[in-house]
């Protein structure tokens, strides 16, 4: 079972994403901030990270850089309510960019595709 780490400072979104991804057969872990997410990556490496950009403390862009510095083989999906970040070249290092929505279809499909692609490359 593939393990997905969800890093988002909004509890209701963490729960929504966790519920939908588990429904699709993924194991999930959740982190309320980037620091906690990075700890999980060190101690219990996930197969994929769903990462919010705007969070208190360390933002998702800095966390993305730290994830890539540690292990650039873990796919990262940037997930944000602000589509303007898509133009920020710092976000281009992510494997995918999804704009937050109450409809999780795009996020779930993106996770599936990236994990499938990652399995083929491994």
Where would I find each of the regions flagged by the language model?
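C-terminal output helix
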Residues: 102-115, 119
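Helix N-cap/capping motif at the beta->alpha junctions
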Residues: 30-39, 60
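Active-site residues of response regulator receiver
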Residues: 52
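Short amphipathic alpha-helix used as the core "switch/output" element in two-component signaling
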Residues: 39, 61-72
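Hydrophobic/aromatic residues positioned on beta-strands within the core alpha/beta folds
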Residues: 77-79
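As written
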Residues: 60, 90-98
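Receiver (REC) domain active-site loop signature in two-component systems and cognate sites
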Residues: 55
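Charged docking surfaces used in two-component/phosphorelay signaling
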Residues: 15-23
